[in-house]
């Protein structure tokens, strides 16, 4: 998927009514389909994982939407996926 389109999809996806358990783990599983060795980094209130452009460019729109629904977003400062 085009990177700018992926960012747009993330911003527009309604996540209010989406309920799923293990949102962090599920997002990491999706990322693992597009990156051989996902190595997340953790802080007290955020998780960062995978180069955004590298993974999003390989994803179909459905996976980008799923990531948004799971609460993953584009961290512009670090150019990666993030979850709070």
What are these regions (language model features)?
Residues 42-57:
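Terminal, regulation- and interaction-focused segments at domain boundaries
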Residues 1-46:
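N-terminal leader/targeting segments
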């Amino acid at each position: 998927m085009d990177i700018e389109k992926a960012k747009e999809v993330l911003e527009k996806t309604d996540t209010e009514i989406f309920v799923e358990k293990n949102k962090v783990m599920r997002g990491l599983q999706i990322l693992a389909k597009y990156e051989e060795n996902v190595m997340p980094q953790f802080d007290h209130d955020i998780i960062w994982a995978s180069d955004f452009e590298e993974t999003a460019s390989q994803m179909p729109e459905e996976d980008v939407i799923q990531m948004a629904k799971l609460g993953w977003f584009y961290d512009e400062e670090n150019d990666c996926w993030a979850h709070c």
